[in-house]
Design a protein with these regions (language model features):
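Sec-dependent bacterial lipoprotein signal peptides
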Residues: 1-13
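Acidic/His/Gly-enriched intrinsically disordered linker/tail segments
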Residues: 209-270
Length: 322
């Protein structure tokens, strides 16, 4: 596989033919807009009623449970919308997402495409609201709940304060669909949990990235991977070097969680390789391996997600960028 020094655009798609009709009904998803509803809440009692009316999606979103701590949890969540900044946040969301339903037509197309070749028939309900930066996205098999305020442009005055910049960079409008789809499909992405090797986890991440890229063909691969243009260009140019590093340091079959997290977890850089190599590089490498496997595989996307034997993918990938 030749390393690529440019942004990958998948076959059959260019940004010129990615104009998606936004005046049609959704085919696979439903979208519930609670932005105005939550803005209308003006006291703790009405907030509690609002949560109860949408209990199946908002209790999990606000991490509220029917326990003795219920009222404390509700009161704590209410403080995030009962403050002087919430009006500004509401105005910002309405300004930047004038018609928020239009955001999700690519996601609807994704589920349409997936369902056409799958025994799964996935038709989640999407709920959008302003969370006061309580939560970004939660999912279950029937729902995707999105705190739209998390995805305001990076230049917006109000952004979450508890996230480092290398993570916050991914919370932008262009990332909404890829993060939503990745989060949702992760529920169907099987992995052999008894196998502790790094390559097992790398392949699992790679499967998810690959499936999302095929379902969102008009989203740049760097967006799906969560890299900047500069980072994506760098890792593609240095693919052979990065893979050689993994081989020379015998990382693929490493089982130490501490070591694995250096290459799989959120970090500003993978310092062990180079200061300029971004974090989560093991996930990116897993995507390259899975992509090589799928070049000659007859697997459907559903079958790929269900494949929990990394050996089948790894040893049949013929991956060798060196």
């Amino acid at each position: 596989i030749k390393s690529l020094a440019f942004l990958i655009l998948f076959a059959g798609c260019s940004y010129d033919n990615c104009n998606i009709k936004t005046n049609e009904s959704f085919k696979q998803i439903t979208v519930q807009n609670l932005i105005t509803d939550i803005y209308s809440v003006n006291n703790l009692s009405s907030f509690n009623s609002f949560l109860l009316e949408n209990k199946n999606v908002l209790y999990p979103f606000y991490e509220v449970e029917d326990t003795s701590f219920l009222l404390d949890k509700v009161a704590n969540a209410f403080t995030l919308i009962d403050n002087v900044y919430f009006d500004s946040l509401y105005n910002d969301v309405n300004t930047h997402f004038e018609n928020p339903l239009n955001l999700f037509y690519p996601l609807d197309n994704s589920f349409t495409k997936f369902n056409q070749q799958s025994n799964y028939k996935l038709s989640p309900n999407i709920t959008i609201l302003i969370s006061g930066f309580f939560n970004d996205i939660i999912v279950d098999k029937e729902n995707i709940v999105i705190g739209l305020d998390y995805f305001l442009p990076k230049t917006n005055k109000y952004k979450p304060r508890d996230l480092p910049s290398y993570i916050l960079d991914r919370y932008s409008p262009e990332h909404i669909n890829s993060i939503s789809l990745s989060s949702y499909l992760s529920q169907f992405n099987l992995i052999n949990e008894s196998d502790l090797t790094m390559i097992n986890e790398m392949i699992s991440f790679g499967k998810l990235y690959y499936v999302v890229s095929k379902l969102l063909p008009c989203t740049e691969q760097r967006i799906i991977l969560g890299y900047s243009e500069k980072e994506f260009e760098l890792v593609n140019k240095n693919e052979a070097f990065i893979y050689s590093f993994f081989l020379q340091n015998e990382l693929l079959f490493e089982e130490s969680n501490l070591i694995k997290q250096k290459y799989l977890s959120e970090r500003p850089s993978t310092f062990e390789i180079s200061q300029s190599v971004p974090g989560r590089i093991g996930r990116w490498l897993g995507w390259r391996i899975v992509s090589s496997f799928m070049d000659s595989s007859t697997y459907t996307l559903e079958e790929l997600l269900k494949e929990d034997d990394y050996k089948n993918i790894f040893y049949n990938s013929n991956y060798n960028p060196i």
